[in-house]
Amino acid sequence: MSGLIGRKIGMTSIFDENGKNIPCTVIEAGPCVVTQVRTIGVDGYEALQLGFDDKNEKHSTKADLGHFKKAGTVAKKKVVEFQDFVSEHKLGDVISVDLFSEGEFVDIQGVSKGKGFQGVVKRHGFGGVGQATHGQHNRLRAPGSVGASSYPSRVFKGMRMAGRMGGDNVKVQNLRVLKVVAEKNLLVIKGCIPGCNNSYVIIQK
């Protein structure tokens, strides 16, 4: 498995050779620095730790500064491990968007937009209770019954109710890479990806 850390720029659309309008997402992918190399002998597994997006030194702890100094780079805001990286890299190597090529498929992981406290109609797609007429006046978006009566005298775990929506780790799989703009470290991905603009995403292939 290989991958990069990126930042979601936003959505746009492009036209293909047949004149079809395709919605797509632009991602600033890398460059990422190898900040640590995990080995089986020391750590029990193989992985590369990549860092992305420079961090102000005054906002970093001494432990962070020492960790990134070993890799010969400044402190990074986002650090992610990629296990079983396909190609060999050493500490301090820079991995760029050239890792990807046009036409291949990638998986993208991010944190979905937070929606706050929402009801069951928006959060779970409930249809509401009853109809809008014939005396009904306050149950249009109600959840309805949440359990039985005296037996089992409780609400089962996992019952879908109102609550906080969004802000979850979401992975979208098999998204096609439409364009790779190497000189600007940009990836153009077909379709939408989780997260708001300027949020961090993990791109895997």
Curated annotation (Swiss-Prot):
GO terms for cellular component: ribonucleoprotein complex; ribosome. It comes from the Bacteria. SUPFAM superfamilies: Translation proteins. One of its GO terms (molecular function) is rRNA binding. Pfam families: Ribosomal_L3. Belongs to the universal ribosomal protein uL3 family. NCBIfam families: L3_bact (TIGR03625). This is Large ribosomal subunit protein uL3. It comes from Flavobacterium psychrophilum (strain ATCC 49511 / DSM 21280 / CIP 103535 / JIP02/86). The lineage of its organism: Bacteria, Pseudomonadati, Bacteroidota, Flavobacteriia, Flavobacteriales.
